[in-house]
């Protein structure tokens, strides 16, 4: 909001939706990762793909989505925000791109060893219940590839009402 016009408002509404779905998926996956590793410290969580592949995949997909990689919905919303910024406030575009780059590097640096790092732990005999993680990620992926017309209409109406 504040970037200018209905397209920016539409992008902001879409971003709030996909970002919150992605973040909740990451929180669910991180909770399972902490239970799997027996610690809440990120430094103590390593090699999730080897120990619990479903937790590892859930965390990795959530991280890729929150980083704004295509085809996830966060990419679509950030793309709309950046294109609106380029049109309405060209000076803000480099700042946004740098901020996205810093966020990308920081998140990737922390998540990569959690998912792919070396571990002494043995694989778990069972997989935790990760339905919420993969449901949210599937919704974010869907919104990156296809927006249901009813949802697009609702966002357009809300964007116009916002200003």
Task: Tell where the protein language model's regions lie, with residue ranges.
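Helix-coil boundary and interhelical linker segments in multi-pass alpha-helical membrane proteins
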Residues: 1-15, 84-91
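Transmembrane helix-loop junctions in multi-pass membrane proteins
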Residues: 3-10, 68-80, 145-152
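Histidine-centered catalytic micro-motifs
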Residues: 14-24
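Residue-level recognition of pore/gate-forming positions within transmembrane alpha-helices
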Residues: 19, 63, 100-101
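Interfacial and helix-entry/exit segments of alpha-helical transmembrane bundles
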Residues: 22-94, 121-140
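Cytoplasmic/organellar membrane-interface segments at the starts of transmembrane helices
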Residues: 52-55, 104-163
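Alpha-helical transmembrane segments of multi-pass integral membrane proteins
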Residues: 90-110
């Amino acid at each position: 909001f504040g970037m200018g016009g209905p397209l920016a408002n539409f992008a902001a509404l879409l971003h709030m939706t996909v970002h919150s779905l992605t973040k909740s998926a990451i929180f669910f996956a991180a909770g399972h990762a902490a239970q799997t590793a027996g610690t809440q410290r990120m430094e103590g969580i390593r090699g999730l793909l080897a120990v619990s592949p479903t937790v590892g995949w859930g965390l990795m997909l959530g991280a890729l989505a929150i980083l704004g990689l295509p085809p996830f919905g966060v990419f679509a919303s950030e793309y709309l925000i950046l294109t609106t910024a380029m049109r309405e406030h060209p000076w803000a575009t480099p700042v946004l791109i740098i901020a996205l780059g810093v966020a990308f590097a920081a998140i990737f640096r922390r998540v990569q060893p959690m998912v792919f790092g070396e571990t002494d732990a043995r694989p778990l005999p069972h997989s935790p219940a990760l339905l919420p993680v993969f449901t949210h990620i599937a919704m974010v992926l869907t919104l990156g590839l296809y927006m249901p017309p009813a949802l697009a209409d609702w966002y357009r109406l809300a964007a116009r009402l916002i200003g």
